[in-house]
Each structure stands twice: as structure tokens, then as C-alpha cells.
């Protein structure tokens, strides 16, 4: 049986990257929440 997680840097960035987050309203909220919390890494 094939495992569910097949790592790919491109797919990771396109789905969870900064530009992907900023492009949606919900994503902007995620970034804002992480900024307010003081996270060092905002995305991925």
C-alpha cells in the first residue's frame, strides 16, 4: 500500500505557502492571527 504523504516542495508551497495564504480571505486571517500571536514562522 502506498503511503498518503508523498513530500513535494512545490506542492507544499503552493498549498500552504505565504502567497497561497495571502490570496484568500481565510488565509489573510491565518497570517494575521499568527502575526498577533508572535509566531516566528508565519507559513510552512
From Swiss-Prot:
Organism: Phytoplasma mali (strain AT)
Keyword Ribonucleoprotein (UniProt): yes
GO cellular component terms listed in the entry, alphabetical order: ribonucleoprotein complex; ribosome
Regions that span the bilayer: none
Top-level taxonomic group: Bacteria
Underlying gene: rpmH
GO terms (BP aspect): translation
Lineage: Bacteria, Bacillati, Mycoplasmatota, Mollicutes, Acholeplasmatales
InterPro entries: Ribosomal_bL34 (IPR000271), Ribosomal_bL34_CS (IPR020939)
Similarity section: Belongs to the bacterial ribosomal protein bL34 family.
Protein name, entry field: Large ribosomal subunit protein bL34
Keyword Ribonucleoprotein tagged: yes
NCBIfam families: rpmH_bact (TIGR01030)
Example of a GO MF term: structural constituent of ribosome
Alphabetical UniProt keywords: Ribonucleoprotein, Ribosomal protein
One Pfam assignment: Ribosomal_L34
Amino acid at each position: 500500500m502506498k503511503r498518503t504523504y508523498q513530500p513535494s516542495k512545490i506542492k507544499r508551497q503552493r498549498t500552504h505557502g505565504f502567497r497561497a495564504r495571502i490570496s484568500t480571505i481565510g488565509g489573510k486571517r491565518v497570517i494575521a492571527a499568527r502575526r498577533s500571536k508572535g509566531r516566528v514562522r508565519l507559513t510552512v
